[in-house]
């Protein structure tokens, strides 16, 4: 009786695990700054180019290194101290945001410079994301992994609410540059939390391996990881579903500046409200997974949210009413985060420790890399040719068709 009562408290993991509490607080504050930068960068790209294609291009360039290097980075993460890796890459993010602030503040920002800085950020992200994601189980243990992932998602979505709201005010009062400056400052919070974390030493099967051996064997290890993930079963089916959703479903977020301005006739403040609506929904979805929804059948929730997400994005593409768009984005946020948090947890729990870094590397390669490098680039090009509503609607329809087919042919997904 006690265990269910405890699990219904979505914040129990924060109370129980000091290391995760430090990580979560610092990460959430930093993500607020990151969402400010995301909103400001999309708006700045649109101002400098007046092109949906360029907005998609800026988003996609930062994802190219994630596609190219993620699996090698995952092999490196599996051989490394993950906490140290996260500390170093977060420091790189701080420097990148500071340079972006300085260039924009002095009026020297150009599309070319934005592309270069986005590429540098992508290189760091290729290493940081699998290290950070696979570190969560070390902070809380296997028993609390699912609620910890859900709470991590809740912090992400809390930041998506607060960050764009602050960004809208900052852009209006002080200009776009200060969004980048505040983001640079926010990385101080996450670095502070990371340096306070103390993790026990975990014996590595790669202990004693020299640095040059890590480099020369990373390709072999990356291929071994791919072979493991390609084995028939729930992991492969779920990764396929996640991949198609990330490439065709998620990139609608990249074109939100264009939809806000051209379809819904909103300014930067209105664009911030749209992103905040998505964040509020995501926060609710994450808390549902961390709390009461943890008692639902995971397979049924995966199926319901996996089908609802693209259907709601199709409805969003069709609307020209800002209030309806806000309501749809709220609903999209709920189902998108519920699906993502559940799929992330299922994948990690079904993958051995020695492959977990490479699993999360593949996950980040798809969610951050292919989603932006392929999905955002393609949807931006299509939007430039036929209109943003057709681009978003068609990509979501592809996602819906694939999800329907996958759930129909993989009944074991309903039993995870």
Summary of predicted features, one role per range:
Residues 34, 120-132, 332-343:
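Core transmembrane helices of Major Facilitator Superfamily
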Residues 58, 67-72, 79, 85, ...:
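C-terminal transmembrane bundle of multi-pass solute transporters/carriers
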Residues 6-65, 227, 231-278, 373:
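Helix-loop boundary and gating motifs at the non-cytosolic
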Residues 26, 151-159, 241, 362-367:
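Hydrophobic alpha-helical segments of secondary membrane carriers
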